[in-house]
Amino acid sequence: MRKIFITLVAALGVAATGVSQDVTGTIRNTDGKPLAGIVVTDGYTVTTTDAEGKYAFDRHDEAAYVYYSLPAEYRVPLRQGHPCLYKKLTDDKVYDFVLQPLKGGKEEKFRLVMVADPQCQNLRHVYRFHSETAPDLKKTAKKTKTPCYAISLGDIVYSEGPRNANYLMPMIKEEMRAESIGMPIFQTIGNHDCDYEPVAIGKRNSTPTVRLQRMFEATFGPINYSWNRGDVHIVSMNDIVYDVINNFKKYHGDFTDNQVEWLRKDLSYVSKDKMVILCVHIPLEHMRKSKNVQAVLSMMAEFAEAKIMSGHTHYSRRFTHSNGIHEYIFGAASGCWWWSNNNGDGCPNGYGLIDIDGNKVVDHRYKSTGFDIDYQLRVYRGNATFGGKHEQPTLPFGADKILANVWFADTDWKIEVYEDGKLSGDMTKMKTSPYRGDEHPSLTSSKDWWAIGYNTGVVGRGHKKGSTRKNYCSPCHHMYIYTLKNPNAKVKVVVTDDKGRKYTCDHVIEGPEYELAAPPVYKVSEVW
């Protein structure tokens, strides 16, 4: 594995002379016809091809690739099962591309599959992705009647300073091949995908952020890029800024000035009647006060529709920014870092489904790994005791209360309670508990103590007070509560989503029932 790591880092040691070099090329279709108006970039300069399909610009000192924004009318080109819209910059000056038209033309309807935080730290984690996530993604793609394209939302691996898991990047990349998951997957960098190994300082690596992204680039290609499907312009960007090179904790969510300028140029070639989707790792909801984030949100608001897709939090949330742009924050594919089958907010390991028609999102759902699409909620008794040998949290609400975790609920969803077959009333959304503090059950706690009870009480993660406990006591933005008229009644909770679909749960969890939380046990050989 170490050999793979060294080889990949060495592969990016290109053109480190620090002087600008002309980059030229021609873009044609498979019939040899030159293509005009194709957007080409090195991540800094943005230009388009002329009537003869030609482009030219001076490369930026820090640029590693030349690449194009894939037009909606052309197929996603694959290399070894992965999208490849780029070529590595070398001492050459000419970089030509050939695009293959889609047989049926532009795809008006398609599905985006959002995979947040696979976050593999070791071979067992990769094996769980291989055995659980990948086949589930493939099954979803097979069932979908429209073309499917996946997008990762960062933290492909779990590097953290001296705990360097970047050697797993080539392995997880292999598991993410289109043949393995049933669709091509575009990548977004996360804060745990950074390279903490020493990298030469110079014009090509002028900031900690640029130096730390080199391993990810070597494996997956450009960091800031765009592509088009139907009437949608899709952008992936790095939104992690590192303050120093030698401390993995010294980062914050934001965009650099260079990135904002690159995005401004990229969007200048997009018609205002299109929808723009921005894919990042850290939710922009976390950094709304940043001037560069506000600049990005302002640019996006100029289009007919705009959406943001993010991960990072290991919980599920829907958020609307002040300018009306909706952000989807997706639960992690790895849940609580593969220790269980659920995220810290009780949302199961899984991924998001975004269905698009024209320039509109026409449907959105969360798909739990290993479960049917209708698995959308879990119900608890208000006095239940959860956990295991490490700790046993008890809900303080009383036996006449029930709580429902509806992991993709929004304000336009209805959550109803039936007692003995008769409609009793609507559940009330609980006020979301803070991220820090609230580490034990209380009458004001909206957290999912069934999930927390498994991770802290059974597994023992974050059991002792410390910096990691909050990771396993995530806030829950979708917990509902109801007072039963008859605590002894047979209870059924019926959820109706914004499309009128109904999801039903008639099982109330009253204790440490953890068949759905416990991960499978695999025997993984050291060779694998």
Predicted regions and their residues:
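N-terminal active-site segment of His-dependent metallophosphoesterases
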Residues: D22, E73-R75, G81-N164, P487, ...
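Short, acidic Ser/Thr/Gly-rich low-complexity loop/linker segments typical of extracellular
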Residues: Y44-A56
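Extended active-site neighborhood of metal-dependent phosphoesterases/phosphodiesterases
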Residues: A72-V76, L85-K88, G161-R264, S268-V270, ...
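Structural motif
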Residues: Q21-A36
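Aromatic sugar-binding surface patches on proteins
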Residues: R436-Y482
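Hydrophobic beta-strand segments
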Residues: I38-T41, V66, I415-V417
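A short, solvent-exposed beta-strand micro-motif common in secreted/extracellular proteins
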Residues: D61-P77
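Binuclear metal-dependent phosphoesterase catalytic core
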Residues: I325-A409, W413-K422, H477-D506
